[in-house]
Design a protein with these regions (language model features):
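Alpha-helical context
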Residues: 2-5, 9, 13-16, 20, ...
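Generic, well-ordered alpha-helical scaffold segments in large soluble proteins
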Residues: 17-20, 32, 36-39, 43, ...
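An acidic, carboxylate-rich microenvironment
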Residues: 28, 74, 119-122
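Conserved PLP-binding catalytic core of the aspartate aminotransferase-like
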Residues: 50-117
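Active-site C-terminal subdomain of aminotransferase-like
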Residues: 1-71, 153
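Short, well-ordered loop/turn and helix-capping segments at boundaries between secondary-structure elements
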Residues: 16, 20-23, 67, 81-85, ...
Length: 177
């Protein structure tokens, strides 16, 4: 039986992390994460998208999709097929967390791969295009998530955009891989 108390591996991991975050390189990285997030938020808003808090001051962007009549669950699914990882997220005014009206977008992984502000503009375009595709699929397949997913898996347009996203992402290495 293992009881609580200090664990040497946890203490060592914390020491390494504290040393890393105290470097000029980490400060520069952190500033780039926030700059990328702000650029992504501004690019989405410039395309007419609504964000929670009208922007961001940190590494996250909360995108309110309710104006489009599609749920965060559906956008999460379509983006996943396109090789873009997001999280569905409830937004203020949602009636149920099962069908959230938003998507949470983060920039740390993108920044770690070497993406900068110019790349956030391209990503914003991918995101906005995905909503149009989702609306078209929902119109053809119906509002139920299971029907949407079936329609999504049959969409050649979605597959083509997934290939476009993959080609874009291949420009950037994945650290440690």
């Amino acid at each position: 039986m293992h009881q609580g108390g200090p664990h040497n591996v946890s203490i060592a991991a914390l020491a390494v992390q504290l040393k890393e975050v105290n470097t000029p390189e980490f400060k520069k990285y952190s500033e780039q994460v926030v700059s990328n997030s702000k650029t992504l938020a501004n690019a989405l808003m410039a395309k007419g998208e609504k964000l929670i808090c009208s922007g961001t001051i940190n590494h996250l962007v909360m995108w309110d999709l309710r104006q489009h009549g599609v749920t965060g669950s559906k956008i999460e699914k379509i983006l996943d097929v396109m090789h873009i990882t997001t999280n569905k997220n409830s937004v203020v005014g949602d009636k149920s967390a099962v069908n959230p009206g938003g998507i949470r977008l983060g920039t740390p992984a993108l920044t770690t791969r070497g993406m900068t502000e110019e790349h956030m503009e391209i990503i914003a375009d991918f995101l906005v295009r995905s909503v149009k595709m989702a609306k078209d699929i929902q119109e053809k397949s119906g509002k139920k998530l299971v029907d949407f997913v079936a329609g999504l898996n049959e969409s050649e347009e979605v597959k083509a955009m997934g290939e476009e996203v993959t080609a874009f992402a291949k420009q950037f290495s994945i650290p440690g891989v």
